[in-house]
Design a protein with these regions (language model features):
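Structured C-terminal helix/loop/strand segments within mature extracytoplasmic catalytic/sensor domains
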Residues: 2-83, 108, 227-245, 269-336
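Active-site-adjacent helix/loop patches that line small-molecule binding or acyl-intermediate pockets
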Residues: 60-73, 143-146, 154-232, 240
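Acidic helix-start/capping segments at beta-turn-to-alpha-helix junctions
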Residues: 68, 72, 94, 136-152, ...
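Short, conserved catalytic-motif segment at the N-terminal edge
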Residues: 85-109
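Structural recognition of the beta-strand scaffold that forms the well-ordered cores
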Residues: 88-91, 113, 168-171, 180, ...
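Active-site SXXK
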Residues: 110-141, 286
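Short glycine/serine- and small hydrophobic-enriched flexible loop segments
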Residues: 122-130, 218-225, 307-311
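Short Gly/Thr-rich strand-loop-strand
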Residues: 243-264
Length: 336
């Protein structure tokens, strides 16, 4: 009986022991065990995939296209170089959205020849406009004024109105008429003082009678802007220097519709022409001096330069197109 009871007790206890041995996490089960330690920081870093390698940017080629003004300058330089002459060019735009100026050898000194008559006639116009001088005042010839020129009717006691002498000196570039006007103005010193007062600082007029393209342009710009007597002076001056006897320089490169107020000069292998040009909405001042080639070739160079500049001016826009940045997108309203 005792033996049977012991066996019964053994049968009851054995399953309980087995249950205890297989309880998860009890650690009682004998034999090899696998211990999983917590994941460390270094292990996690190794698990992160490496950042993609930066792809090298391809080089960007920027193409810079020359502007129309750059092309104009290059073309004028080519015309001057091909001529074989010394060439001075001075351009100042008086119209358009961007009033450019151009000077190629503009400060180089050239023999002025009759170009001194530009400031001379401007001085006369200013005096007429201010009332200091009368267009009908009679000015008389002095034998010391004589120089070969267009007219030959000067003699002792001959007198001419200021208007008559201005037309002779301007439209026909007559030398004796210009000498009479210089004398009544106050002589060469007075002429040079007047010229320097509005920017002709590199010129030595009359003697040795030199000037530059930039100086001649300065004279015309001041006249065109009304700084030398205003519209009254212009109304007196412009007809005197329009449709002259010498139109084979700057006017020859322009359309017949253009108004060209200008004055030429030529002597000792030098040709000068300086002008105020107006045609519709376009206006500008151009001065060109050429030295070192024969006279006919010199005028041809001036005409070619004039024509190329006109071609450029004709293609310029009439106004500036404003660049308006696009409006920034509006942010959605935040509702609370």
């Amino acid at each position: 009986m005792k033996r049977g009871a012991g066996r019964l007790l053994s049968l009851l206890i054995h399953p309980l022991l087995i249950g205890l041995l297989v309880v998860p996490g009890s650690g009682v089960l004998a034999g090899p065990t696998v211990s999983v330690s917590p994941t460390t920081q270094s292990t996690r870093l190794l698990a992160v995939p490496p950042a993609p390698k930066a792809v090298a940017e391809l080089p960007v080629t920027t193409l810079i296209t020359p502007s129309a003004f750059d092309t104009l300058q290059a073309d004028l330089q080519a015309i001057a170089a091909q001529s074989g002459a010394q060439v001075g060019i001075s351009l100042q735009e008086l119209s358009g959205p961007r009033r450019n100026n151009l000077s190629l050898n503009g400060r180089q000194s050239f023999y002025a020849a009759s170009a001194y008559k530009v400031p001379l006639l401007m001085a006369e116009a200013q005096q007429v406009a201010s009332g200091q001088a009368s267009p009908s005042e009679r000015l008389c010839f002095d034998p010391r004024d004589a120089e070969d020129g267009w007219f030959t009717d000067y003699g002792d006691g001959s007198c001419f109105t200021r208007d008559e002498l201005a037309v002779r000196a301007g439209r026909y570039s007559d030398n004796t008429a210009a000498h009479i006007l210089v004398r009544y103005l106050g002589g060469p010193d007075a002429l040079n003082r007047f010229a320097k007062s509005f920017g002709m600082k590199a010129s030595a007029l009359w003697d040795p009678n030199t000037t530059t393209a930039d100086d001649l342009t300065a004279a015309w710009v001041n006249e065109a802007l009304g700084r030398l007597g205003g519209t009254t002076a212009q109304r007196w001056l412009y007809p005197v220097l329009s449709h002259t006897a010498y139109e084979h320089g700057i006017p020859a490169g322009l359309p017949g519709s253009a108004t060209v107020v200008h004055k030429v000069g030529a002597m000792y292998g030098t040709e000068n022409d300086s002008a105020y040009v107006v045609n519709g909405r376009i206006s500008y001042v151009l001065s060109v001096s050429v030295d070192g080639i024969d006279e006919a070739a010199g005028w041809s160079v001036i005409a070619r330069i004039s024509a190329r500049i006109w071609q450029y001016e004709l293609s310029r826009p009439e106004f500036v197109v404003p660049v308006i940045p696009p409006e920034a997108p509006r942010q959605p309203e935040t509702r609370y």
